[in-house]
């Protein structure tokens, strides 16, 4: 497929990465809505204001459920591993806000050297890529939708953000939507969360405030932050498309007031062009949740948007977090010489 893109094409660089103008309420995210307790005041209030999603959400609640023994792709070992990881992640989530406060004295920091140290340290610890950006309003959810502070407004407390990715194993993801893919997914949610938490703790030791944004405790939209930090481009499936691994990564973010050097990210328009023509993820999506048409203006930005209700309903029906789009994306192929050559040709 990549060889087709060696043919010169005038429109290849006409597609630009756009950014949203509006902030998103975390309570509107389907993974937050699933936590609403039927019959509770919060449940009644939400669906009174959003009746358009009530029917689909009720259908999803009636489905087997994620990681359930009655699920279509149930596998005792891999499901238990995923649930074990989720349990640890939930406990790590308590450390996001219940952490040692910053040291009283701020260390003198050279922004460029601090960034270099962070990148080397995290890469040695297992990160695939690390990037830095200024924290923007559109990076943040407007209100919290999960946890004890659900419904609380989210303000911009920090000036900078550090995004990191970790690789999901190619062989494990090739089995998607089988149980081993959800096991790998949770493995890397945990790994990215550990890296973000220890980075936030390190920054506090230097006397600067920092917050880790990990699975179940996001105040930021990680793909947007990672794209602005130069780690990739947001593609057709709504995920971060990294240069070497495509969407086969998990992301975590640390927001902070630690002075950091960053450069304005230059979007890779060739990736957008590839997504514009390829459409493989849309064709293989078992729930037809990925659009196969052109980008549209959504929330003030020109982009593709998946049908998250359809996607999630398949999750709870199959018992895994699917991953078919990730496993079939041509950019997800192993990072070897042949596929690096194909990616070079696409550019």
Predicted regions and their residues:
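Iron-sulfur (Fe-S) cluster-binding modules
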Residues: 1-133, 158, 327, 331-347
């Amino acid at each position: 497929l990549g060889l087709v893109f060696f043919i010169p094409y005038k429109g290849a660089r006409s597609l630009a990465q756009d950014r949203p103008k509006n902030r998103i309420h975390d309570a509107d995210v389907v993974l937050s809505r699933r936590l609403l307790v039927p019959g509770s005041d919060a449940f009644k209030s939400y669906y009174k204001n959003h009746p358009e999603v009530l029917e689909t959400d009720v259908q999803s609640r009636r489905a087997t459920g994620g990681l359930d023994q009655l699920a279509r792709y149930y596998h005792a070992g891999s499901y238990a591993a995923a649930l074990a990881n989720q349990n640890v992640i939930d406990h790590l989530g308590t450390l996001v806000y219940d952490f040692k406060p910053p040291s009283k004295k701020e260390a003198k920091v050279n922004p460029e050297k601090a960034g270099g140290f962070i990148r080397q340290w995290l890469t040695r610890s297992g990160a695939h890529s690390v990037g830095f950006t200024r924290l923007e309003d559109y990076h943040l959810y407007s209100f919290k939708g999960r946890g004890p502070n659900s419904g609380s407004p989210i303000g911009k407390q920090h000036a900078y953000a550090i995004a990191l990715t970790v690789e999901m194993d190619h062989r494990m993801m090739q089995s998607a939507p089988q149980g081993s893919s959800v096991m790998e997914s949770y493995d890397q949610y945990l790994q990215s969360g550990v890296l973000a938490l220890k980075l936030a703790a390190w920054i506090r030791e230097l006397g600067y405030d920092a917050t880790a944004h990990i699975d179940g405790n996001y105040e930021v939209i990680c793909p947007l932050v990672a794209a602005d930090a130069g780690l990739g481009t947001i593609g057709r499936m709504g995920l971060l498309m990294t240069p070497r691994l495509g969407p086969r990564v998990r992301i975590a973010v640390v927001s902070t007031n630690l002075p950091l050097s960053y450069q304005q990210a230059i979007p890779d328009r060739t990736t957008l062009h590839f997504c514009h023509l390829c459409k493989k993820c849309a064709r293989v999506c078992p729930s037809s949740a990925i659009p196969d048409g052109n980008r549209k203006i959504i929330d003030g930005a020109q982009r593709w948007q998946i049908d998250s209700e359809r996607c999630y309903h398949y999750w709870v029906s199959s018992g895994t977090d699917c991953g078919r789009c990730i496993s079939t994306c041509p950019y997800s192929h192993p990072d070897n010489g042949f596929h690096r050559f194909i990616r070079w040709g696409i550019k």
